From Swiss-Prot:
EC number(s) on file: 3.4.21.92
Pfam families on file: CLP_protease
Name of the encoding gene: clpP
Protein's name according to its UniProt entry: ATP-dependent Clp protease proteolytic subunit
Entry-linked PROSITE patterns: CLP_PROTEASE_HIS, CLP_PROTEASE_SER
Coiled coil: none
NCBIfam families recorded: clpP (TIGR00493), PRK00277.1 (NF001368), PRK12553.1 (NF009205)
Keyword Hydrolase: yes
Keywords assigned: Cytoplasm, Hydrolase, Protease, Serine protease
GO molecular function: ATP-dependent peptidase activity; ATPase binding; serine-type endopeptidase activity
Functional description taken from the UniProt entry: Cleaves peptides in various proteins in a process that requires ATP hydrolysis. Has a chymotrypsin-like activity. Plays a major role in the degradation of misfolded proteins.
Amino acid sequence: MRATPPRDDTYPSNENFKEKYPMSYVPIVIEQTSRGERAYDIYSRLLKERIIFVCGPIEDHMANLITAQLLFLEAENPEKDIYMYINSPGGVVTAGLAIYDTMQYIKPKVATLCIGQACSMGSFLLCGGEKGMRYSLPHSRVMIHQPSGGYRGQATDIEIHAQETLKIKKILNSLYSKHTGQDVKHVEKSMERDNFMSPEEAKKFGIIDKIITHRDIKLLKDKEQGQ
């Protein structure tokens, strides 16, 4: 029997995404040091500034990379905030939960910021950021819905996987309720079908705390001085 893990979206797999949109054109930045020049890919350079990107479909390989970055930044400075930028259509539930659990596990606060879209597990990670530090740019889109999956094989095995998907659904509803402040029944009803939201609607629902149009330099300086 072959069965796909529970997914919360209907988007293509990460392999198809990579084939269609090759990631080989990542910019390289040059930094001058006392020992000469040092080259970084742009994401590694931003990691030095404690910025993590969750971009594209969420699957196991991405989850491993994101959790490794979170753990590295905690080891480097457990008192300093981490900034997670999200532009994702969603993906595999268990991969998203691995990232979420690590966000809750580590000591640094994790601020989340939606750029472009935060759909399915992307919206789950967005609302799982530190309370008061969950942001969205003004023209981003947020979407929540219940998990889905495709299975085949013997009827008994299909039933087992269906029950597992229902358990995952219950867990996600409970966690969305925890982070948004919404009643579980309201969350379940809101996630029955694809539910697209503007940043204003996402804020009202409790997924984000603030819509930002410009970088708040004073806020960042105040946070740095408080650390």
